[in-house]
């Protein structure tokens, strides 16, 4: 007769395509009943499935000698079982203080970094963790109570990408009670973490006071929550694809540290896609290392920020992320140091690279470019005094405007073009050797410029503005 626990896990693993044969699996083992049940299950399948098993254990050093004894327990167990064991002691409290995060997040980051390292070392395809069905119920309830993103409400994923393989949770189809029964049957005596009973933690209170009532209503409640989780994940994957597609049409500029979007185009999207669109931007900029202090409230703040009647403003997010609105455009980017005034000579022909990576390239030609757009400036060579100088703006700057009488303040040009204030200090101002402002790239040409219509055969000085920024596609 088949063991009920093993049979249920087998069915779950097969249903969700969790494991492939001939694989190396790193098993996270704390010494508690959940991870030990997972280890013994995989060992039972090792010969038939041709698995290679590596155990990984992290001592977070939260409980002094007691947590060190957990490490020794796992080492001794693996020695007796003939299983490779990799362990590490990490002062998580120190890491927590250094990076300003709560203890649970700090422990998770340290643990996952170690698991990734062991995965690389053994070229493993999977990292297996012992989360079970009751954990799934508690997680979903906790996120509903605290608030989360739609992806968060889906709970714990059965299988997700991790390093060059997958992080898997084969025990999500069984309950804690079934795990304890399996351990008792095999006469496994696990280590017990006393913090799992402390009611200071929300999860422990839900486990003690809420979960028993749910199980009274339906003993298989974990299966219902798991089904809910899978449906949420499937729906979320579809909506994420839609949001990704829409956002690539909304984004106007993108670099490694900054993304800009059109607010009217963004607001034309449905609200579910708006929320996911903001999440995509945050994932990209934070490189999927979202600060623990960031929550769904912040996404709602961005959406409310767009609805304000004021044409400009800013929001400060964790990790020095700043969101700046300027009229109908909004930029998400990390705070930069104050831009110092700059001055550079530009030879003709020649090239200079600006602080933002963009370039100004000059040439001399008897022919003018076929495309005379805002990235090109053309003047008669002999009308300009050399060398050209590229500098930051100065108080009182004015320039003559092509096709207009008199001069105009550069400040007024920036305001009319709705250039954000923080961008104005780094905007290049092109002057001749006499100090005349001859071009404000992308914005205005001076009276020194010639148009395509008035151009005749002559010797011309041409300046090209070349941006390094890619178009606005968000990397997946």
Curated annotation (Swiss-Prot):
The record's subcellular location field reads: Cytoplasm
Keywords (alphabetical) are: ATP-binding, Cytoplasm, Ligase, Nucleotide-binding, tRNA processing
Report the EC number(s), separated by commas if there are several.
Answer: 6.3.4.19
Spell out the reaction equation it catalyses: cytidine(34) in tRNA(Ile2) + L-lysine + ATP = lysidine(34) in tRNA(Ile2) + AMP + diphosphate + H(+)
Q: Which GO terms describe its biological process?
A: tRNA modification
The record, for Gene3D superfamilies, names: 3.30.465.60, HUPs
Q: Which of this chain's residues are annotated to bind ATP? A: 30-35
An MF annotation (GO) of this entry? ATP binding
UniProt-listed Pfam families: ATP_bind_3, TilS, TilS_C
Q: Which cysteine-cysteine pairs are annotated as disulfide bonds in the entry? A: none
Can you tell which superkingdom this protein's organism belongs to?
Bacteria
Give the record's GO CC terms.
cytoplasm
Q: Does the keyword Nucleotide-binding apply?
A: yes
| Family per similarity comment | Belongs to the tRNA(Ile)-lysidine synthase family.
Notes concerning its domains:
The N-terminal region contains the highly conserved SGGXDS motif, predicted to be a P-loop motif involved in ATP binding.
Function summary: Ligates lysine onto the cytidine present at position 34 of the AUA codon-specific tRNA(Ile) that contains the anticodon CAU, in an ATP-dependent manner. Cytidine is converted to lysidine, thus changing the amino acid specificity of the tRNA from methionine to isoleucine.
Under which name does UniProt file this protein? tRNA(Ile)-lysidine synthase
Gene name of the encoded protein: tilS
């Amino acid at each position: 007769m088949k063991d009920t626990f093993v049979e249920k896990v087998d069915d779950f693993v097969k249903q969700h395509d969790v494991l492939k044969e001939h694989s190396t699996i790193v098993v996270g083992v704390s010494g508690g009943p959940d991870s030990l049940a997972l280890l013994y299950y995989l060992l039972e399948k090792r010969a038939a499935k041709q698995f290679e098993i590596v155990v990984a254990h992290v001592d977070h050093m939260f409980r002094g000698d007691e947590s060190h004894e957990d490490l020794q327990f796992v080492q001794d167990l693996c020695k007796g079982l003939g299983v490779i064991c990799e362990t590490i002691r990490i002062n998580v409290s120190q890491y927590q203080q250094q990076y300003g995060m709560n203890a649970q997040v700090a422990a998770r980051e340290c643990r996952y970094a170690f698991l990734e390292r062991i995965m690389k070392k053994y070229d493993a395809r999977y990292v297996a963790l012992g989360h079970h069905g009751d954990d799934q119920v508690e997680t979903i309830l906790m996120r509903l109570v605290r608030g989360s993103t739609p992806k968060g409400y889906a709970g714990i994923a059965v299988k997700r990408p991790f390093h060059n393989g997958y992080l898997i949770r084969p025990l999500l189809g069984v309950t804690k009670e079934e795990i304890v029964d399996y351990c008792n049957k095999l006469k496994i005596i696990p280590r017990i973490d006393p913090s799992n009973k402390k009611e200071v933690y929300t999860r422990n209170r839900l486990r003690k006071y809420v979960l028993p009532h749910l199980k009274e209503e339906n003993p298989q409640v974990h299966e219902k929550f798991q089904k809910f989780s899978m449906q949420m994940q499937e729906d979320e994957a579809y909506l994420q694809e839609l949001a990704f597609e829409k956002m690539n049409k909304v984004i106007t500029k993108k670099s490694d540290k900054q993304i800009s979007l059109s607010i009217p185009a963004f607001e034309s999207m449905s609200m579910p896609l708006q929320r996911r669109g903001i999440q995509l931007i945050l994932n990209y900029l934070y490189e999927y290392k979202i600060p623990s202090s960031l929550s769904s409230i912040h996404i709602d703040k961005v959406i409310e920020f767009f609805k304000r009647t004021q044409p400009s403003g800013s929001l400060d997010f964790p990790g020095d992320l700043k969101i700046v609105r300027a009229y109908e455009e909004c930029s998400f980017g990390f705070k930069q140091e104050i831009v110092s005034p700059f001055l550079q000579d530009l030879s003709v022909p020649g090239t200079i690279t600006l602080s933002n990576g963009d370039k100004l390239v000059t040439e001399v030609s008897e022919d003018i470019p076929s495309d005379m757009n805002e990235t090109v400036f053309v003047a008669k060579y002999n009308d300009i005094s050399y060398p050209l100088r590229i500098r930051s703006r100065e108080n009182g700057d004015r320039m003559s405007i092509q096709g207009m009488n008199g001069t105009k303040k550069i400040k007024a040009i920036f305001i009319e073009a709705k250039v954000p204030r923080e961008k104005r200090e780094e905007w290049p101002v092109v002057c001749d050797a006499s100090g005349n402002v001859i071009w404000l790239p992308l914005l205005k040409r001076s009276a020194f410029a010639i148009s395509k219509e008035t151009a005749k055969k002559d010797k011309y000085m041409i300046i090209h503005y070349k941006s390094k920024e890619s178009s606005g596609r968000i990397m997946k």
